[in-house]
């Protein structure tokens, strides 16, 4: 069985809630992946004396969902019940927990749950080789604690801008690379021993068996980075998401898109669903999960924004009808053709950060109404190509996501030239054999044929584009 389905699974899991002056919504979609390996946690009011605290997290599993699912249920308990976390609470209430104790307790909780899961029989005997990233926030009345282990990401939107982002843990990062090499490993094609695309994770015990090294000195470390930030009146929202989201949207793009959607709807589940759909239409091939946490100062629904959004929908509906009427004599155009025509137009008031992909559902609804016999699969534009042509487009798209500078410009030109040739009926270029190197390469990998956690299925990536946005943009104290 391959890593991808023939058609994406677009059914979504949703949840929402409110409390402690917060509102949250979440959405997750399996997408093109054969399995759903993401999980999440959302707790408003932490039990046992922390009722005015809240905890949210996203877990991006790889090589299976075992670790991600267990962590989503038990990580918070491992954090709040260990002695390091509770040390300061002995003298008073939860409000008196010191910042350092909370941060140390979070770190201890990660190490303890990783040690605990190692004893599971299926993980111990190698029957299950899964692992998971974890990104979360613990929100107290005065502080926000950002927690990250892996390459999922959290961002804080404050006073109309992205003011903080967690840093992705990639093998190519100098600090991570040094630890990997000190443990006897190597970094090849941006991966640990040429295979695993994250340098910190829970689980992944095949990468945590170097004799004489502690748990935080292994090829893959379970140690999280913890940042503490004082809450402010200007705080608007926090986004937690896996790399299936960040692969196709930058920090700023996603935050601007979310802000624009909050101005047209106060339903946080809907906003999260729009994000997931938009990322699918932008070409994400991974599982997708997002948790949106809104503070009291989050953007409110605006009559003007609602009006502009409605006018945009009507304009798009009208244009789709016109395009299909003009093409009537030549036969019904496919949806990809309609999208290409619209993408070449200067359409005002498209959702910032989302662009035309953010209105794909509107366009597709009109197209399906006018062409009821079409088999809709919810795929992105590239996925509507067939056979080797579709594979070529996908390979070029994945390379485009993961390259910058001159390489990226070259790939943009290749992709544009290919699409133009197809539209004009010219012969398409042959599919290059080495374009999409398997991400499951086991070169130097202690795990044979394990599905590696990767942001794209191309092993040719020079630089991970998401690192461009990673890292703190504001001085948050880090453990």
Curated annotation (Swiss-Prot):
**Ubl conjugation among keywords:** yes
Q: What membrane topology does the UniProt entry give?
A: Lipid-anchor
Q: Lipid anchor (N-myristoyl glycine) at which residues?
A: 2
**What are the PPM-type phosphatase domain coordinates in residue numbering?**
23-295
The terms describing its cellular component in GO are: cytosol; membrane; nucleolus; nucleus
Expression sites by tissue: Highly expressed in heart and skeletal muscle.
Q: Which cysteines are joined by disulfide bonds?
A: none
The protein's predominant localisation is cytoplasm
SMART domains in the record, alphabetically?
A: PP2Cc
Quaternary arrangement and interactors, per the entry? Monomer. Interacts with PAK6. Interacts with the phosphorylated form of IKBKB/IKKB.
Name of the protein: Protein phosphatase 1B
Gene name of the record: PPM1B
